[in-house]
């Protein structure tokens, strides 16, 4: 039940720190009765402020949200509203009893790389894409509906998962038009 608050390019006052902690605690206890830890970062960039909020629940679920505004308090309020909305969806998901609590999960490597150049671009001989981040994530077994719900609870652009029964790899992702796309590897012909 810890809330860590930090500021980038700005100082966070004690009253704002207390307000953030109380608001996070209020949102979590409203929808979830387990333990949690949270990291809130408020950043000033130019004349705007952004607040990034990451919430780790005891069930292993990680919820992320961010907000932007002209005032740091307003930016945090926007992020807090999004976190509360995701907590509400998570509670509804738990009530539906569709989640298998991740007991059918596999650990996989997760890499984020720089974009590959197009075929008509000049590519130097020593070109190698830069790996921006490399972590290990759990590859869970879940239905497409649960995968869309899990994608909706985070700000991640892509979620890879295994389909139940067949063990095929599937991907759900956010499309540029705002909709969710689904790639079923079983339907891809080589």
Swiss-Prot record:
Give the Gene Ontology MF terms in alphabetical order: ribosomal small subunit binding
- Does Transmembrane helix appear among the keywords? no
Spell out the subcellular localization from the entry: Cytoplasm
| InterPro entries cross-referenced by the UniProt entry | HPF/YfiA_ribosome-assoc, HPF_long/plastid, RHF-like, RHF/RaiA, Ribosom_S30AE_C, Ribosom_S30AE_C_sf
Q: What is this protein called?
A: Ribosome hibernation promotion factor
A biological process (GO) of this protein is: negative regulation of translational elongation
**CDD domains noted in UniProt:** RaiA
The cross-references to PANTHER family, in alphabetical order and at most eight, read: 30S RIBOSOMAL PROTEIN
**Could you describe the subunit structure of this protein?**
Interacts with 100S ribosomes.
Q: Which UniProt keywords apply?
A: Cytoplasm, Translation regulation
| Keyword Ribosomal protein applies | no
The record's section on HAMAP family has: HPF
Q: What does this protein do?
A: Required for dimerization of active 70S ribosomes into 100S ribosomes in stationary phase; 100S ribosomes are translationally inactive and sometimes present during exponential growth.
Q: Which GO terms describe its cellular component?
A: cytosolic small ribosomal subunit
Pfam families reported in the protein's UniProt record: Ribosom_S30AE_C (PF16321), Ribosomal_S30AE (PF02482)
Family that this chain belongs to: Belongs to the HPF/YfiA ribosome-associated protein family. Long HPF subfamily.
